[in-house]
């Protein structure tokens, strides 16, 4: 992995941690949605993750097809361009199910660079 990719992966992991902090006290999509600040902060950080994916090299993405890079970038586009029409239940599913998986995959990529 190139140094550029390594630092982007680290940044993505930090961004995931922010989302976790902003959303950890909530038990449902509706509960999170009612808190404008935390909801908006989490959504903005999903956009940031999508932007970070766009900066990764094609080589890294091709070698790590277990991560659906296009789906992550597509979420960024949906949130950035259709913010008022997003389904909060889908966002909640992403936060509670998909984000921990992505974090694990990115940590594995980070560890590969240390070998």
Locate the predicted segments by residue.
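Solvent-exposed interaction patches of small proteins and small membrane subunits
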Residues: 1-115
